[in-house]
Amino acid sequence: MNNSKNFNLFLMDGEVTGRIKCTLSNWTGIAYKIPRTYLDKCKDRLDLKQSGVYFLFGKNDDGDDEVYIGQAGIRKNGEGVLFRVSEHLKDEIYFSDAVMLTTQKTHLGQQKFLI
């Protein structure tokens, strides 16, 4: 298996319904799955102050699944992807979970796209 990969899933709250951090060996990227109600517990995570892309998962008025996809850069106030996702708490768009893709270090800088 020359193309095999090893994912590391860290249950940040010790439960699968809580926050999950996902890393992949030999990749500088990092993914977080964070329930809406846990967003405020992530304010001290420096990697979530980086630029990144995010997915907001929820249901529409008909009960159908939907996803909103967005991107965030590093702002002048030093905030990044988590701050942008938190801004959606004021929107009419309801979401139950957020998935954020960013970097473990400042490898992304102000880039517009993740590859």
Regions found by a protein language model. Give the residues of each.
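Conserved short loop/helix modules at catalytic or binding sites
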Residues: 73-115
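GIY-YIG nuclease catalytic motif and its immediate N-terminal context
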Residues: 1-80
